[in-house]
Curated annotation (Swiss-Prot):
This is T-cell differentiation antigen CD6. Residues 651-665 have a biased composition (Acidic residues). The gene is Cd6. Cell adhesion molecule that mediates cell-cell contacts and regulates T-cell responses via its interaction with ALCAM/CD166. Contributes to signaling cascades triggered by activation of the TCR/CD3 complex. Functions as a costimulatory molecule; promotes T-cell activation and proliferation. Contributes to the formation and maturation of the immunological synapse. Functions as a calcium-dependent pattern receptor that binds and aggregates both Gram-positive and Gram-negative bacteria. Residues 536-665 are annotated as: Disordered.
């Protein structure tokens, strides 16, 4: 992650660059080009044809710009001009008289016979009484005695040049300031800046604006950084920028290739020292006409390419490129660009072919003789500038590759983080296991639960399971439809009649009043809604409580149901049956050895035990007991069946507490 952040920061720094250049109105002398022109027009004087605005031939503005005659020029006038143009003081002023070839048209050196017939430039003053321009007076006077022009170079002279290229129109940009040559930093360097340099050097327009290390690194100070030209400036120092001696080094020296620069290459051969001659000029590649392609021209080309001397000039092919160049050399020139040349001259190249040459540095001739092997092996197939030059497209390609690599790293990091998160989620987020089989209870095994039981038990309420003990074979008594239980470790099926008794449990107060009616069971609701009283049935009422011993509580209702949800009713006669005083004989229940005490309406009733023929079981294995009620005459409406029955209570022991044995094992 830290590596990714570091690469992102580096890419941001490369793309953003250094701070923005200086404001557009800032330059060395505190004026912009328009202000400089206004100053020259206001003063009526300027320096032209020099390397900068502080060097050149002096011209004054009368009706038009006229050159100044040197007949009445003195040192005070030179100092006044330099100060007026903000080019320094007189301490660094020199007088440079141009040669006669630079005189205006019609002027001839040493020809005095035509002096009276020629009107020369007006002198700006006969004599300046001080170093300020306002003390100088312009006189309209002919230059009869001295026909030379005034050439002034002020102390603050500035110049520009291109070095280490194959011609004066290509190379590393250098500026002259304060009498010392220095370089220009390539920060924010573009074609607009390069165009100003090419125009200033009269090299056409800029073809390429090059960053550092395309040419040999320079030496000395760095005069400019973050140059921001608009392309209309006359001089490079008129462009806004900053001093370059703080954040820039010589590995970032700016370079320029102008349209008038010429570079050459040999194509179609076995190496770079053999093939068809092509020239790069004004931004395009052109062929060279062989109409005047002689040994002198071939010799200059092979020498400038570092391929030794010319050994052959094979006949070339027809021209395959649009442009055509014509050269005429003497053989001593350093490059073809210094020879006489013409570009796209149809008369000179009308019946020509593309020129070809074989130099001594070619591999074809290295095995034949070593005397003609060049002193250095060529690296490029043309001049050093176009071949070794890389423009800003390569820089953009580098940034694109860096962005792609950064994107791949980001994608890999994202996938890795997602995998880690998924692994962490699978480790700590385990599914919760829920056991619906175990029921939590606060009671210990074998202890009765006396908490109040709600009247209505929700259907979702857990079932209370009773695990009976395995009865002996001799103690079990059942009808022919008895089905033996499989007393395994699995919990037994809950008794339906037991839950019915718990749901319809009555309070102790109602039991004492002996006036309560048991609400109808859910299992026999369809029978309880009968409006008439059924006929008397001699059969005894059937209870759903199994025999548990000699003493137990009886539920005195004639309405019950089996576990198979089949309702039945033992309807007594109009009179209660006679009570059998004979106590029930003791008989162990076939389900448990210890008989439970069932609480019915809070009133205990003790019986000796049921008879053997009164006990039976259903097909589902649930026991129920048929017993005869005690000899008590309850109200007749209490024994209506299938209506809600009335309870019967027998008080055996007043000190005995009401309890309900659930039959804990």
């Amino acid at each position: 992650m830290w590596l990714f952040l570091g690469i992102a920061g580096l890419l941001t720094a490369v793309l953003s660059g250094l701070p923005s250049p200086a404001p557009s109105g800032q330059h060395k002398n505190g004026t912009i080009p328009n202000m400089t022109l206004d100053l020259e027009e206001r003063l009526g004087i300027r320096l032209v044809n020099g390397s900068s605005r502080c060097s050149g031939s002096v011209k004054v503005l009368l009706e038009s710009w006229e050159p100044v005659c040197a007949a009445h020029w003195n040192r005070a006038a030179t100092e006044a001009v330099c100060k007026a143009l903000n080019c320094g003081d007189s301490g660094k002023v020199t007088y440079l008289m141009p040669p006669t070839s630079e005189l205006p048209p019609g002027a001839t050196s040493g020809n005095t016979s035509s002096a009276g017939n020629t009107t020369w430039a007006r002198a700006p003053t006969e004599r300046c009484r001080g170093a300020n321009w306002q003390f100088c007076k312009v006189q309209d006077q002919e230059c009869s005695s001295d026909r030379r022009l005034v050439w002034v170079t002020c102390a603050e002279n500035q110049a520009v040049r291109l070095v280490d290229g194959s011609s004066r129109c290509a190379g590393r940009v250098e500026m002259l300031e304060h009498g010392e040559w220095g370089t220009v930093c390539d920060d924010t360097w573009d074609l607009q800046d390069a165009h100003v340099v090419c125009k200033q050097l009269k090299c056409g327009w800029a073809v390429k604006a090059l960053a550092g290390l395309h040419f040999t690194p320079g030496q000395g100070p760095i005069h400019r950084d973050q140059v921001n030209c608009s392309g209309t400036e006359a001089y490079l120092w008129d462009c806004p920028g900053r001093p370059g001696d703080q954040y820039c080094g010589h590995k970032e020296d700016a370079g320029v290739v102008c349209s008038e620069h010429q570079s050459w290459r040999l194509t179609g051969g076995i190496d770079s020292c053999e093939g068809q001659v092509e020239v790069y000029f004004r931004g395009v590649w052109s062929t060279v006409c062989d109409s005047e392609w002689y040994p002198s021209e071939a010799k200059v080309l092979c020498r400038s390419l570092g391929c030794g001397s010319a050994v052959a000039r094979p006949r070339g092919l027809p021209h395959s490129l649009d442009g055509r160049m014509y050269y005429s050399c003497k053989g001593q020139e350093p490059a073809l660009s210094t020879c006489s040349w013409r570009f796209n001259n149809s008369n000179l190249c009308s019946q020509s072919r593309a020129a070809r040459v074989v130099c001594s540095g070619s591999q074809r001739h290295l095995n034949l003789s070593t005397s003609e092997v060049p002193s250095r092996v060529p690296v490029t197939i043309e001049s050093s500038v176009p071949v070794s030059v890389k423009d800003k497209d390569s820089q953009g390609l580098t940034l694109l590759i860096l962005c792609i690599v950064l994107g791949i790293l980001l994608l890999v990091s994202t996938i890795f983080i997602v995998i880690l998160l998924l692994r962490a989620k699978g480790q700590y987020a385990l599914p919760a296991s829920v056991n619906h089989q175990q029921l939590s209870t606060a009671n210990q095994a074998g202890i009765n639960n006396y908490h109040p039981v709600p009247i209505t038990i929700a259907k979702e309420a857990p079932m209370l399971f009773i695990q009976p003990r395995v009865p002996a074979d001799s103690d079990s008594s059942s009808d022919s439809d008895y089905e033996h239980y499989d007393f395994s470790s699995q919990p037994p099926v809950a008794l339906t009649t037991f839950y019915n008794s718990q749901r319809h449990r009555v309070t102790e107060e109602e039991a004492q009043q002996n006036r309560f009616q048991m609400p109808p069971l859910e299992e026999g609701l369809e029978e309880l809604h009968v409006s008439h009283i059924p006929a008397a049935d001699p059969r005894p009422c059937v209870a759903d409580v199994p025999s548990r011993g000699s003493q137990y509580h009886v539920r005195n209702n004639s309405d019950s149901s089996t576990s198979s949800e089949e309702g039945y009713c033992n309807d007594p006669s109009s009179k209660p049956p006679p009570w059998n005083s004979q106590a029930f004989y003791s008989e162990k229940s076939p389900l448990t050895e210890q008989p439970p005490n069932l609480e019915l309406a809070g009133s205990p009733a003790v019986f000796s035990g049921p008879s053997a023929d009164d006990s039976s079981s259903t097909s589902s294995g649930e026991w129920y007991q048929n017993f005869q009620p005690p000899p008590q005459h309850p109200p007749a409406e209490q024994f209506e069946c299938p209506g809600p029955p009335g309870p019967q209570t027998d008080s055996i022991d007043d000190d005995e507490e009401d309890y309900d044995d659930i039959g804990a094992a």
